[in-house]
C-alpha cells in the first residue's frame, strides 16, 4: 500500500514540476512584454519627464515604506523592452508609467514644485491596507487554482473518470476477496456433486499441499469451468473462495481491456504480481472468452490489443518464469472459441463441465432456494423437480421467487402448490392474459388445436407424457400443451424424434380435420419440427439417403444464417437435405392425422373440456381419454411433506434400505410360496398404437439436442416452446434453459 502511495506521489510531483517549469520558461522569455501598457521607469527619469512638461497627471500612494508613483504622459511614447536574456523585443507605444521614490519631505517637495510649475495634476492616495500579502495572493491564487485543476484532470485520466489516480490505469481492478463477507460454502451449491469433488482437491491442496507433494503431484495451474448459462459456475468459484481461506482475486475478462493500448497486458502482469505476493492464492476470471478468444480471427488490427492481453496471460500462466502457488480459475459458456494455447495442460490442467442438473440435483437445488421461503404442506419439491427437466439453478431460483411473489400478491402467509404451478406457467410461457378478448371461432380453433397435440402425445407416449394443456393465452401464445419426458434423457433416438415431430404436427392436423382450414397458430410448431428434422438429417445421420455424415453443426449453421460463412456442402446436397426435411415433416403430419382420425371421440371430449375448464392437468386428461369423464375431486390428491433436511433425508434413506433388506430376506425364506402367490399388478392403460415395443432410448447427446428439440440456444435433450394458436407471428416465450419440457402449441 505504501509503495502505491509513493508511486502516486512521484507521478503527481512529476506532472506538477513539468507544469511549473513550462510556466517559468514562458515567463522567462516573454515576461518582459508585460510592461507594454505601463512603463516602469526610474525616479530620475520621472523627474526629467516632469521637468520637460511631458507628464499629464501623477498619483502618489504610500506602499511598504516608499511612495508608489503612477501617472500618464501627455503624448504616447515609443519604448522597447528586453527579456531576461537581454534580447530586445518589438517596440511598443505606452501612455502610462510607474516608479517609486523615497518616503521623505525633500522628494515630495521636489515633485510638488515641478508639478505646480507645469500645471500637472497631483493626486494623493491613502496607503494600501492589504499590504504585500494580498498582492502576492492575487498573483499566486490563479496559479494555485490552475495547478489544482490540472492535478484533478490528470487524476481522472487513468480510468475514464474512475477513482484511480495518475498513471494508475495499468493496475488491475481485482482485489482480494474478504473471507468474512463471503458466506458461500459447498453446502450452498446443490446438484453439482461431481463438480464439487473435483474442486475439493484444489481446496485441500491449498490448505495442506504436503499430502499431494509427497506423491509427486503438483498444484494444478488452472481450472476451467464450462457449461450453459445459469448452471452455477460463478457460484462454484465463490464456494471455493469460501472454503479455501486463501486470498481470492476475482475479475471479469472484459476488465482487462480499456481504451488505452497496452493496458490489458499491464493489468495481467499486475494481477499475477499481486497474486504471487499473496501465494498460495486463487485468481478467478469470469467470462474468460472476452479476452481468451482464438487469435488470428480478427479482420485488420481491431483485435491486436486483445491478442496482446491474451499473450501476456499465456506467459503468466505457464511461461519462462513459472507460476508457483497461484491457481487460475475461469468460467465460460463458450469454450469452443477459446484459444488452443490457453486450453492446453500446464495452463488449464483441469476442465470441469458444469452441466444441467438431473432430477435429484433439481430437487436439491429447490431445497437450497426454499430454505428462506415458508412452504405449505401441499408443496412437493420432488414433484416440481420432475416437472422441470432442463431447468438450471438460475431457472429454479427464479421459479421459487416468482411463486413467492405470487403468494405475497395474494396476501398469503405460505407458498402453496397453486402458486408454484402458476409460477411454472409464467416462467415457461409468460403471464396469463385472462382479459384478452378472443372470439368464439378462434377459441374453438385453439381448443381443438391443443387437443390435437394432446391426443397425439397420449398415443405416442413411450418416452413422454402429457403434463398439462391450456387455452389460456400467455405472452404471445394462445395456448400450449406441455409434454414431459418420463425420465431424464441425455440421448434422443430416431423414433423419439419422429414422435416429437408428430406431436408438433397434431395441432395443424386437428385444424384440418375439424374445420377443414389452416391457421397461423401452428407456425411455432413448424419451426420446432423443422429444426428437429434438419438436425436428424445434417447432424445425427438419421437419413437413409445422405447416410451417417455430419453436414453442419450448430456453430456453422449460426454463422451461415448470419451471412458470415459459406455452406460446407454442394447445392445438390442442399437440395437432398431440403427433400429429406420435407419428407420427414410430411410423414409426421400424416402420422398425426391418422392418430386424430382414429380417436375422434376422445379428441372432441378433450376439446370440449378445454372450452369449459380452459386448463386440464395430467390426471384430468387421462381420465377423459380412458373413461370420457372428468375425475372426481379428492382432497388428498396431492399428499406431500415439507422439504426435508439433510439428516431427515438420510434417515429416510436408511429406513427404506432397511425395509428393502427385510423384504428381500423374507422373499428368500418363502421363495416357493411367493412364486405361487405373487400378483402381477399393472396399470390399466388403453392399447396405444406405436411404432415398436422397444423402450424409447435417445441417440443425440445433450450438446446437440438444442437444435433438434427447441428453438433455444442451450444444449438440451428436448424442448419448451409456445405458439399462439390463431395469433400470427407467435414466438417462443420460454427461457433458454428449460428445454426438456416439450410445450407444444
Curated annotation (Swiss-Prot):
Extent of Polar residues compositional bias: 705-745
Low complexity composition-biased segments: 690-704
Keywords: ATP-binding, Cell membrane, Hydrolase, Membrane, Metal-binding, Metalloprotease, Nucleotide-binding, Protease, Stress response, Transmembrane, Transmembrane helix, Zinc
Signal peptide boundaries: none
Cytoplasmic side: 1-11, 153-745
GO BP of this protein: protein catabolic process; proteolysis
Listed cofactors: Zn(2+)
PANTHER family: ATP-DEPENDENT ZINC METALLOPROTEASE FTSH 1, CHLOROPLASTIC-RELATED (PTHR23076:SF113), METALLOPROTEASE M41 FTSH (PTHR23076)
Protein name: ATP-dependent zinc metalloprotease FtsH
Organism: Lactiplantibacillus plantarum (strain ATCC BAA-793 / NCIMB 8826 / WCFS1)
